[in-house]
Amino acid sequence: MKVSFTATDFQAVLVEFQQQTGTTCHLSGHENTLTLPKTLGEGRVRSINLREGIFDLFVHQHRLDESLLIAAASRSPASSPVVLKFFVSGLVDGAIQGIKADVNAVAGQYCFVYCADQASHVEFVAGKDICTVEIVMTPQLFQDMLGDDQQMSQFQQWFNPHKLKPYWKLGKTSPSMAIALQQILH
């Protein structure tokens, strides 16, 4: 199944996803829970708003009966989030215009990604238990968090707010990260 988004606001994306898939949504304060329809498989996606409009935590836990391709249209750099995504189980493939390498990851890896104004897509592969945890923030919040820390110079060189371009960095989840992920999940 393919789902395409044209909206950039999370609430509008949520409505588009519900309309295209038949997913049900439960809202409770700062937390949204999407329950996947049986036609897709089973599982849910939780989103927790940590800071209104600029900082969210997403937890994907599902097993799909058919692969799900989610495509996002090009958007302004200011509305394209900076994402730190951890892969706890399963396989995820994707592509971002402007990045030559395949964008894919398996359990035990994490990625740091920014799509800038480029279109992108991600495919959640059927037949596998997929569990991911992602931290999503605005470019401005990310820049504010970097501050003047010299240890963050790699990101500061890439993260020029006037010349933002797509970025993808894959790494191995450390034991400390894995413990934190388990605490988030349980």
Task: Identify the residue ranges that each predicted region occupies.
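Extracellular structured ligand-interaction cores
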Residues: 54, 79-83, 129-134
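Generic structural motif
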Residues: 8, 62-67, 87-91, 138-142
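Glycine- and acidic-residue-biased ligand/ion/polar-headgroup-sensing regions
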Residues: 62-64, 78-99, 109
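Short, charge-rich binding segments
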Residues: 48-49, 72-78, 85, 91-94, ...
